[in-house]
Each structure stands twice: as structure tokens, then as C-alpha cells.
From Swiss-Prot:
Binding site for [2Fe-2S] cluster: 49, 122, 194
Recorded superkingdom: Bacteria
Record-listed E.C. numbers: 4.2.1.9
Protein name: Dihydroxy-acid dehydratase
Function comment: Functions in the biosynthesis of branched-chain amino acids. Catalyzes the dehydration of (2R,3R)-2,3-dihydroxy-3-methylpentanoate (2,3-dihydroxy-3-methylvalerate) into 2-oxo-3-methylpentanoate (2-oxo-3-methylvalerate) and of (2R)-2,3-dihydroxy-3-methylbutanoate (2,3-dihydroxyisovalerate) into 2-oxo-3-methylbutanoate (2-oxoisovalerate), the penultimate precursor to L-isoleucine and L-valine, respectively.
Source organism (scientific name): Prochlorococcus marinus subsp. pastoris (strain CCMP1986 / NIES-2087 / MED4)
Length: 559
């Protein structure tokens, strides 16, 4: 084992005052030569996603001790996207990714920790931890809190998206208020992250593919005992990784990021994965850009039938073989790199050697490669005069990913939702929500409430919604997010007017407004940059330093 980083605070006569503080928190003489390992605990009763994390943190803490390390636990924040959705509070969601990253980096570096075990549940916990891990490059492992089991109502599987869609169904007269309340009371049965292949489960899968969490751990149910066993094993492996000096940046390679993109295409993952993978790769110094997603999409089919657009939830994927089974199918067809390593030091080929090349029979959650749900990936990167830097379209679950229609312009999510619930949006409309980008929001809110209301009203196939904001992992329909440049910095989305004809064509990767360059420049002359919405506090700070979404909306981009 190399010299411990923590020796800076534990060794030598001059560190006697430092050791005195450590003795007060439980260190004894023999502990000062052991690796000090941070346990970044995202436990919170704010959200069901994180309410089960403390038991995992305590299991991991004890396992670190038994393996010969010294754990030091500290807290990280979380924001509940599901609770803040559709409110001003949602502006803090993406911001929380940076706060989580900053807090983990700050605690670990300030205390000269030798490694970190991060534990998270809700959406931004995962990328926040990964950004911190990439910044520090100390031996690290991530423990996912686990997915929630499906809610049940009259034999039907429910998720939190069921509740959002019920609002649209109520306003369009498809259900009554009694049914709405029944869905509300039954869709979230306990602890765990939202149960479809939404953002949290997508990002936990990304971490597993990158090799920084254990095989199968990204699809386990939060309330199952195997999750506790996995937490204990994760701690043991981290202590061993410190001894072997296995560091994150040896695992975070161009090839491993390409593997992660390939897997999220195959499983039907969230649009947010584009933003987060770009951010993590940027921090790791890996050349991954938005065009890599389209390049990989063109050759990778969707082989998992998962909500929001599909039939099953993540616990069903786990029963069918989890991410390792998906990876083995992709490896066998040459779609992922087999030489990437994980935190245990094993290559992809070594880790998957005992897994069959065909998915299990008597299940249809995971399909074979020659019988996909879709022949190409579901996250299309569109470009055109509305998004010269690119944007992300989610096209799973829709029959025709092409729509041309008149623009309906909204300057905020709230205004748009009000119009939808008043039945003002008609088939053929292209709904535009702008000034919701990283700078303009600020914070790039997710538009789950409007999209769910559109789907609930039966317009999911007939209306396109485009925005410089984001979409929840629970969103489906013809939706286009992350439009860059955003409206607040003068992107062309700021210049369009009510009734302008917009084409959204995911087949040809095109998003355009039918205006000449000359007309757009004429409109730009009269455009005024919007004033800052926040003068103080974290949102004000964020809006001043955040990058464009096409670079991951990071806050520490090198100038």
C-alpha cells in the first residue's frame, strides 16, 4: 500500500493536536496507521428515495472497520425532484448536483481522507457523487440506495409518474377525483428511488457500467436484504482498492463512458443521462461530447421494455438479470468494450464470463439483440437553427417521431401547465417552454408536470414539447429538451413567436423553425436579454457560473 494521504493529519509530533481531535471521535493508537475513509451519507427523510440510506451507511461503516479502515461519516444534501416538481423549488434540483459534488470534495480533501464511499438515492445524488469522485481521484465506490417496488392498484403496477398523468386524465374527464386519490395513495409504497427506468435508476446503471459500484447493485430494491449485503461488500472492496491504489480515473476512460452510453440506450434510460455523463466526463478529463450519443444511438437497439414508455419497472429488470445480463448481450454482439476495468480490478469480460449470452427464457423484460423494442436508441441528438449546439429528443414509445406545427410559446413552465389544464393545447401544436435553461431558469427545471398532463389528455402522440429546460426520467412522448444555446443567452429559441412553424424530426435529427437567417437576425436586433431573476443566494451564484447544457451544465469549466 502506498503512503496514506491521511498521514498528513495523523503522523509526526507536529500532528499531536490533530490526533487529539481524532481520539475524541473514536480513534486509538493503532487506528492512526489505517486508511481513513469518508462515508458520504445522503440519508434524508425529505424523500422516499433517501429514507433508507442510513441503515446502508451504518452497515458500510461497520464493514470498513472490519476490513481494517477507519470510517468517518458526514452528510450530503438531497432535493426531492418528485416533491419540488412543477414549483419554484425545482430550480434547485440541478443546482443540488453541484452542491453535493462540492460538499463531498470539500469534506474529503479538507480531512485528507484516503478514500470515499458515497451513498445516494435521488436523481442528483449519483452524478453529484461521481463529479466529486472524478475531481478528487481517490479510491472510491458508490452505493445506490435502491429502487422502489411498484405500487399496486387493481392489479396494475404504478409509479410516481402514474400520479402526474392522473392529473391530466382528471382535467380531460378520463378519470374522476376518487380515482386520482386512489392512484396518489398507492403509487409509492415505501422506500426507494422512483421505480421505472427514470433518472435515478439510469444513473445508478451508469455508475455500475463505469465500474464504480458493484455488479447488480444498481437494480436492487431498496427494501430487500441483498441491498444491505451489497453495502457491506462494497465497503470491503473499497478498503482493498485503497491497498491496491485503484483510482477512479483509471476506470473512467473514453471506452468506459462509451459503454455507459451504450447501456443507457439499450435499457431506455433518461434524457438526463446525457447531461450528467457530459458533466462527469468533463470533470474526468475525458473527451465525450453530445455527438457521441447520436453516434452510439445509431448502432444500439433498445432491448429492455421498461417504464416510462414500456411495461416493466426496475425490480423486474433485476429479476431478469440486471445490468450484467444487458452488458453480456451487448458484449457478445461487439457493442461494448470488454477491456474496461471495475473497482475490483476485473475487466468487463472477466466480470461477465459466467453470464449467458442470451436473456433468460419465460421473461420479456430483456429481449435478445435480434428482437429489440426499437432498432435504434431512443435518445436522439437533434440540431438545426433552433439548437446549433444540439438538444436531446426522447422518442421511445411514440409511433412517429416527426411533427411540424405552429409554435405555442410560454415563458415558464407554470404558464404552460395552466394552458394545458385549460385544454388550450391542440393536436399538431409545438409547445415551446423557454427561459428555463441553466442560466435562464436558473437551474434547468424538469417539465414532468406539462408532459404528463399532455399524455394524460391523450395528446402524447399529437403534440411536441420543446424546451431549454430538462425532462424528468419519467417523461415520454415527443419531447425535446436541453436546447442550446438557451433563450437567456440569446439562442434562437428566444426569437420565435406564436404561430411560427417548427419542425421536430427525430428521424433526420433536425429541429428547425421556418425562418430565414435574415429574419432571425432582424428579430435579434429587437431582442433584450432578460434581467436576472435572483440577485442573491445560490441561484444567483449558479446562473453566473454555469455552462451551457451541451457541455453538461457544469460550474467549473476551464476558461
Amino acid at each position: 500500500m502506498n503512503k496514506l494521504r491521511s498521514s498528513a493529519i495523523t503522523q509526526g509530533v507536529q500532528r499531536s493536536p490533530n490526533r487529539s481531535m481524532l481520539r475524541a471521535v473514536g480513534f486509538s493508537d493503532e487506528d492512526f496507521t489505517k486508511p481513513i475513509i469518508g462515508v458520504a451519507n445522503g440519508f434524508s427523510t425529505i424523500t422516499p428515495c433517501n429514507m433508507g440510506l442510513n441503515k446502508l451507511a451504518l452497515k458500510a461503516e461497520e464493514s470498513i472497520r472490519e476490513a481494517g479502515g477507519m470510517p468517518q461519516m458526514f452528510g450530503t444534501i438531497t432535493v426531492s425532484d418528485g416533491i419540488s416538481m412543477g414549483t419554484e423549488g425545482m430550480k434547485y434540483s440541478l443546482v443540488s448536483r453541484e452542491v453535493i459534488a462540492d460538499s463531498i470534495e470539500t469534506a474529503c480533501n479538507a480531512q485528507s481522507m484516503d478514500g470515499v464511499l458515497a451513498i445516494g438515492g435521488c436523481d442528483k445524488n449519483m452524478p453529484g457523487a461521481m463529479i466529486a469522485i472524478a475531481r478528487m481521484n481517490i479510491p472510491s465506490i458508490f452505493i445506490y440506495g435502491g429502487t422502489i417496488k411498484p405500487g399496486k392498484l387493481n392489479g396494475e403496477d404504478l409509479t410516481v409518474v402514474s400520479a402526474f398523468e392522473a392529473v391530466g386524465q382528471l382535467t380531460s374527464g378520463k378519470i374522476n377525483e376518487k380515482r386520482l386519490i386512489e392512484v396518489e395513495k398507492n403509487c409509492i409504497p415505501g422506500a426507494g428511488s422512483c421505480g421505472g427506468m427514470f433518472t435515478a435508476n439510469t444513473m445508478s446503471a451508469v455508475i455500475e457500467v463505469l465500474g464504480l459500484s458493484l455488479p447488480y447493485s444498481s437494480t436492487m430494491a431498496a427494501e430487500d436484504y441483498e441491498k444491505e449485503v451489497s453495502a457491506e461488500k462494497s465497503a470491503e472492496i473499497l478498503v482493498d482498492a485503497i491497498r491496491k491504489d485503484i483510482r477512479p480515473l483509471t476506470l473512467m476512460t473514453k471506452e468506459s463512458f462509451e459503454n455507459a452510453i451504450t447501456v443507457i440506450m439499450a435499457i431506455g434510460g433518461s434524457t438526463n443521462a446525457v447531461l450528467h455523463i457530459l458533466a462527469i466526463a468533463n470533470t474526468a478529463g475525458i473527451d465525450i461530447n453530445i455527438d457521441d450519443f447520436e453516434r452510439i444511438r445509431q448502432k444500439v437497439p433498445v432491448i429492455c421494455d421498461l417504464k416510462p414508455s414500456g411495461k416493466y419497472v426496475t425490480v423486474d429488470l433485476h429479476k431478469a438479470g440486471g445490468i450484467p445480463q444487458v452488458m453480456k448481450i451487448l458484449l457478445n454482439t461487439g457493442l461494448i468494450h470488454g477491456n474496461c476495468r471495475n473497482i475490483e480490478g476485473k475487466t468487463v469480460v472477466e466480470s461477465l464470463k459466467d453470464i449467458p449470452v442470451k436473456p433468460p427464457e419465460n421473461q420479456d423484460v430483456i429481449r435478445d439483440i435480434d428482437n429489440p423494442l426499437y432498432k435504434k436508441g431512443h435518445l436522439a441528438i437533434l440540431k438545426g437553427n433552433l439548437a446549433s449546439e444540439g438538444c436531446v429528443a426522447k422518442i421511445s414509445g411514440i409511433k412517429n417521431p416527426v411533427l411540424k406545427g405552429p409554435a405555442r410559446i410560454f415563458e415558464s413552465e407554470e404558464d404552460c401547465l395552466k394552458s394545458i389544464l385549460n385544454n388550450d393545447i391542440k393536436a399538431g401544436n409545438v409547445v415551446v417552454i423557454r427561459n428555463e435553461g441553466p442560466v435562464g431558469g436558473p437551474g434547468m427545471r424538469e417539465m414532468l408536470a406539462p408532459t404528463s398532463a399532455i399524455v394524460g389528455q391523450g395528446l402524447g402522440e399529437k403534440v411536441a414539447l420543446i424546451t431549454d429546460g430538462r425532462f424528468s426520467g419519467g417523461t415520454y412522448g415527443l419531447v425535446v429538451g436541453h436546447i442550446a444555446p438557451e433563450a437567456a443567452v440569446g439562442g434562437n429559441i428566444a426569437l420565435i413567436k406564436e404561430g411560427d412553424l417548427i419542425t421536430v424530426d427525430a428521424t433526420n435529427q433536425l429541429i428547425e423553425v421556418e425562418l430565414s437567417d435574415e429574419e432571425l437576425e432582424m428579430r435579434r436586433i429587437n431582442w433584450e436579454k432578460p434581467s436576472k431573476k435572483y440577485k442573491k443566494g445560490v441561484l444567483s451564484k449558479y446562473s453566473r457560473i454555469v455552462s451551457t447544457s451541451s457541455l453538461g451544465a457544469v460550474t467549473d469549466l476551464e476558461e
